């Protein structure tokens, strides 16, 4: 873990963000591996339009690694925060997913009848939206959140500030 602080990418990031003169520390978190049926990313502020009244959720089958790595194109859902209303749904065909198999992660093929189905129901989109809003309010800044859905329950596996916004929100 400590060596990751000294990679060129990490050093450049700290200089770019003005953090090169601050003390740096590393925390190690141990958490349960969630065998997610569906997983994804959520942004508490729309990352493209930077509209602070919209959040965006991306969802795909299996583990979130497939989305984070860019290996699949996830569904995307835009929610208007103050009205708690879904205003846009884009469903992507997903042919494969990463799943936990013993000690490894493996790619599996998605059944043809499920490939073009909306990954999260509208009800679940709104439920996850509430969690995203609570996390943003808790931290007091726009958040980039990784989530997993297993056996009817959402798990938040990571939350961090959105660092790409140009506007100050």
Give the role of each language-model region.
Residues 1-169:
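Conserved mixed alpha/beta core segments that line enzyme active sites in large multi-domain catalysts
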């Amino acid at each position: 873990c400590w060596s990751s602080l000294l990679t060129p990418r990490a050093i450049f990031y700290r200089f770019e963000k003005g953090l090169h003169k601050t003390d740096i520390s590393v925390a190690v978190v141990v958490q349960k591996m969630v065998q997610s049926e569906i997983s994804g990313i959520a942004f508490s502020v729309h990352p493209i339009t930077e509209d602070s009244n919209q959040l965006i959720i991306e969802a795909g089958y299996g583990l979130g690694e497939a989305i984070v790595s860019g290996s699949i194109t996830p569904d995307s859902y835009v929610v208007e925060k103050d009205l708690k209303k879904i205003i846009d749904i884009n469903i992507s065909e997903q042919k494969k997913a990463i799943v936990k198999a013993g000690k490894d992660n493996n790619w599996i093929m998605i059944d043809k009848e499920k490939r073009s189905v909306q990954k999260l129901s509208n009800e679940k989109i709104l439920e996850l939206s509430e969690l995203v809003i609570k996390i943003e309010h808790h931290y007091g800044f726009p958040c980039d959140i990784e989530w997993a859905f297993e056996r009817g329950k959402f798990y938040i596996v990571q939350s961090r500030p959105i660092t790409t916004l140009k506007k100050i929100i």
